[in-house]
């Protein structure tokens, strides 16, 4: 039931995105993320799992964290200023956004089969990717639309995002086995810095938090 609420939230987010209401699309992505969190927590507390639940969860996640942010990027690419050389491709280039949905599905399929990801992640989790795109487009959309130079940069970011989703970069999870500092240094550093970024930058801060998460994960993995 909770998984279906996540799926419905994703469908609503897609609808808002395609109509150009990106703030409401982000709101429904966040609502879907909350349903996804409580769904997983409930399953762990009750010690229940099933094959159909696992498949439904992945389907819901791809809609909420794959198709919805892709639809937001699609809308942004339809209204951005294009460099003159790319203007003839305006009817076609926005559809590149939907590779985000495809790579999100691939990332979720890998996650279901990868036994290494029980206490941490390998590759960028789809909720983090969705929140990055949602907050970036809502918080900095007007800036992105101001100059044609941002349009190809956005396409490059889409490709980087797709790579991160299926990469082999280890990324930490906010799962605490105990609450002490020792062994949780990276998690506490992330949470403290994230709180500061959110206080300073509000919605745009979410994108900065995700960027910080990627950097900190990659840096930690390189040191270990």
Outline where the language-model segments fall.
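Helix-coil boundary and interhelical linker segments in multi-pass alpha-helical membrane proteins
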Residues: 12-27, 69-95, 136-153, 200-203
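Active-site His/Glu-centered metal-binding helix of metallohydrolases
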Residues: 8, 34, 38-42, 59, ...
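Multi-pass membrane catalytic core of lipid/isoprenoid biosynthesis enzymes
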Residues: 1-4, 45-109
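Hydrophobic alpha-helical transmembrane segments of polytopic
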Residues: 2-5, 25-32, 96-103, 129, ...
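Topogenic membrane-insertion module of multi-pass membrane proteins
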Residues: 1-37, 198, 208-209, 220
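C-terminal membrane-associated helical module and adjoining short loops/tails
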Residues: 118-224
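Alpha-helical transmembrane segments of polytopic integral membrane proteins
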Residues: 11-14, 31, 69, 102-105, ...
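Cytosolic, membrane-interface loops and tails of multi-pass inner-membrane proteins
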Residues: 39-50, 111-115, 119, 173, ...
């Amino acid at each position: 039931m909770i998984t279906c609420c996540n799926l419905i939230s994703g469908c609503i987010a897609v609808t808002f995105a395609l109509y150009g209401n990106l703030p409401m699309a982000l709101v429904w992505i966040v609502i879907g993320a909350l349903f996804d969190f409580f769904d997983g927590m409930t399953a762990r507390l009750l010690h229940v799992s099933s094959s159909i639940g696992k498949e439904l969860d992945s389907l819901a996640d791809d809609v909420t964290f794959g198709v919805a942010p892709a639809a937001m990027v699609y809308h942004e690419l339809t209204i951005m200023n294009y460099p003159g050389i790319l203007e003839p491709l305006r009817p076609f280039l926005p559809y590149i956004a939907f590779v985000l949905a495809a790579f999100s599905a691939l990332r979720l399929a890998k996650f279901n089969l990868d036994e290494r990801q029980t206490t941490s992640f390998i590759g960028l989790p789809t909720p983090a990717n969705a929140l990055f795109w949602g907050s970036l487009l809502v918080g900095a959309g007007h800036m992105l639309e101001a100059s044609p130079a941002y349009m190809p940069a956005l396409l490059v970011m889409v490709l980087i995002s797709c790579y991160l989703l299926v990469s082999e970069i280890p990324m930490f999870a906010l799962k605490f086995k105990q609450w002490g500092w020792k062994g949780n240094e990276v998690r506490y550093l992330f949470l403290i810095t994230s709180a500061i970024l959110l206080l300073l930058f509000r919605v745009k801060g979410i994108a900065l938090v995700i960027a910080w998460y990627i950097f900190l994960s990659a840096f930690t993995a390189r040191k270990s």
